[in-house]
């Protein structure tokens, strides 16, 4: 569905973990935190925390939505 997305993401952000790549893939597909939490079998708040940490790690400014950034990768 998104050929090369994870490869481009890993190239742009080499320190990204497997868990973070999975979260990025779910966000790129347009899934909500609640949907992701169901797939990962974790609490929705845990997904929100992971999103905040991911934003910091990828150095995404507060003006840009995480999902919008991932669509540009």
Annotate each PLM feature:
Residues 2-73:
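Cytosolic nucleotide-binding catalytic cores of signal-transduction proteins
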């Amino acid at each position: 569905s998104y050929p090369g997305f994870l490869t481009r993401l890993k190239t742009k952000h080499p320190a990204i973990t497997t868990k973070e790549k999975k979260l990025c893939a779910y966000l790129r597909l347009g899934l909500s935190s609640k949907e992701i939490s169901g797939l990962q079998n974790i609490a929705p708040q845990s997904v929100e925390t992971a999103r905040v940490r991911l934003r910091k790690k990828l150095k995404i400014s507060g003006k840009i939505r995480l999902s919008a950034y991932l669509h540009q990768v």
